Amino acid sequence: MRLLLVEDHVPLADELMASLTRQGYAVDWLADGRDAAVQGASEPYDLIILDLGLPGRPGLEILQEWRGLGLATPVLILTARGSWAERIDGLKAGADDYLTKPFHPEELALRIQALLRRAHGLANQSQLEAAGLRLDEQRQCVCLNGADVDLTAAEFRLLRYFMLHPGQVLSKGHLAEHLYDGETERDSNVIEVHVNHLRRKLGREVIETRRGQGYRYAGVAAG
């Protein structure tokens, strides 16, 4: 999952970048509101973390612009502004959630997970479950037939994206766009390598190949 972090306080941004990367997210960071307005509307992000007090352009104005353009990407406002009126303004502008600084890193992690599940119609789940597999996002492993299967960081990122899009045909290019940040060279052939690793661990039927199209997450057959 690819996230955009818009935060002008460098120490906090560095801390969040490190934490989110450990959680298996590909993260792009911007500190200027003008840059964020353009990149947030043009790149295929799965979620945006947006500070309100930004240089260049205020975060609330950017959010209103995105929603006016029809951008449906989940947006979590992360700000020191904690008054009730400002929370209302943020939610009215189109924010999906609002977290006031200071905050506990685990709360941010859980809110991000919940927003991503909700965005994919899985809001009623406390953990990510799809087609016979349950993903433990804290330990970055998957439960198969009652047993935990360890995953590498790359396998975890790829499987999480598949499980959030069950039944959808996803091209290598699409997967690369959502699994790597803007600074990483995107080699779609690497996707094939990680798919094969997941098949060896979970069974070949878990991820189908659609020739000329990409891959489809089918999960584990019941029984």
Curated annotation (Swiss-Prot):
GO-annotated cellular components: cytosol; protein-DNA complex
Residue ranges constituting the Response regulatory domain according to the UniProt record: 2-116
InterPro entries hit by this protein: CheY-like_superfamily, OmpR/PhoB-type_DNA-bd, Sig_transdc_resp-reg_C-effctor, Sig_transdc_resp-reg_receiver, WalR-like, WH-like_DNA-bd_sf
Result of knocking out the encoding gene: Abolishes Ca(2+)-dependent induction of CarP.
DNA-binding region per UniProt: 125-219
Entry keyword set: DNA-binding, Phosphoprotein, Transcription, Transcription regulation, Two-component regulatory system
Protein known as: Response regulator protein CarR
Organism in which the protein naturally occurs: Pseudomonas aeruginosa (strain ATCC 15692 / DSM 22644 / CIP 104116 / JCM 14847 / LMG 12228 / 1C / PRS 101 / PAO1)
